[in-house]
Curated annotation (Swiss-Prot):
The gene is HSDL1. One of its GO terms (biological process) is fatty acid elongation. GO terms for molecular function: oxidoreductase activity. It comes from Gallus gallus. It comes from the Eukaryota. This is Hydroxysteroid dehydrogenase-like protein 1.
Length: 331
């Protein structure tokens, strides 16, 4: 009996000395739970605000808020073409920039006839570096540009190891994915600042979310574009300029035609038209968004994954696509 009493006494002493630590752990646990709940509530509210409310209460008057003319780079296919069409639906005149004159003429004519807006185009190959911009400067001179969409981008032929990439591919990716956005902003931003209104949309990628092996240079270039956009937003928001970074996941376009899985529209891989119709409704509402509600869920989960899990999954997925592309190439 005495042994039992001694044990009870010892237990009470230990419990008394540990009570402070138990209370501290309880406070930490409560704080963590509240923080996670608030994050969930905020993310849910953000998704509703971005992707549901604009459809219910009506979208902003883009022409009135930003201006009558928009410039869209990489605008003869995929997201660029679809985004240009969405702008035209809202009464915005479009200036298309791409490297194929035939495609530019066809898309320009189609948009003008379908949406009854003015269109123009400039032939420019962004992979050529500095020489591409003189024609652009001349073409945009004396134009009051209200919206700039930096969509032009270069992707790998298929996911691959860094040492397998050619020097030409590396330079082209730097010129197209990084330099083009800098130069286009540098050309049109002064006019926007002078009018104290304008919008710049830079199409980044969800690969900027975390390091993405086998898309190393592409992912890094899109991470640059994302950071560039976010810094530019804070730098010029007070001057009436809205800057947005779009960070979509895979969209079923020609850019990802290396795989039958990613090039076909599905639940997680929307068409360019479907994506653009959602993305444009976020203009003026979010400085950084995947632009599509399903991609927003994926992006939120991706950001919260440990880096090694993201990297493992990305490399596994990229290896499958690479194998498929090489098999198809060998036939």
């Amino acid at each position: 009996m005495a042994a039992v009493d001694r044990f009870n006494l010892l237990y009470r002493e230990i419990s008394r000395s540990c009570s402070v630590y138990i209370e501290a752990l309880a406070i930490v646990g409560a704080w963590y739970t509240v923080r996670k709940c608030l994050t969930l509530v905020f993310n849910t509210y953000s998704m509703i605000r971005l992707h549901a409310l604009p459809k219910l209460v009506g979208e902003i008057d883009i022409v009135k808020r930003y201006g009558r003319w928009a410039v869209v780079t990489g605008s003869t296919d995929g997201i660029g073409k679809a985004y240009a069409e969405e702008l035209a639906k809202r009464g915005v005149n479009i200036i298309l920039i791409s490297r194929s004159k035939e495609k530019l003429e066809a898309v320009s004519r189609s948009i003008s006839e379908t949406y009854k807006v003015e269109t123009d185009f400039i032939v420019a190959d962004f992979s050529k570096g500095r020489e591409a911009y003189q024609a652009i400067k001349e073409g945009l001179k004396d134009r009051e540009i209200g919206i700039l969409v930096n969509n032009v981008g270069l992707f790998y032929t298929y996911p691959d190891y860094f040492t397998n990439l050619s020097e030409d591919m590396l330079w082209d990716m730097i010129n197209v994915n990084i330099a083009s956005a800098n130069m286009m902003v540098h050309i049109v931003l002064p006019g926007m600042v002078e009018k104290r209104k304008g919008a710049i949309v830079n199409v980044s990628s969800a690969s900027c979310c975390q390091p993405t092996p086998m898309l190393t240079t592409y992912g890094a270039s899109k991470a640059y574009l994302d950071y560039f956009s976010r810094a530019l937003y804070y730098e010029y928001a007070s001057k009436g300029i809205f800057v947005q970074s779009l960070t979509p996941f895979v969209i079923a376009t020609r850019m990802v035609s290396c795989s039958r899985v990613t090039s076909k529209r599905s639940f997680f891989f929307p068409s360019a038209e479907e994506y653009a119709s959602h993305a444009i409704s976020t203009l003026g509402l979010s400085k950084r968004t995947p632009g599509y509600w399903k991609h927003s869920i994926e992006f939120t989960l991706g950001e919260r994954l440990p880096e090694w899990i993201w990297a493992w999954f990305a490399q596994y997925f990229c290896r499958i696509i690479r194998k498929e592309a090489l098999t198809h190439k060998a036939k």
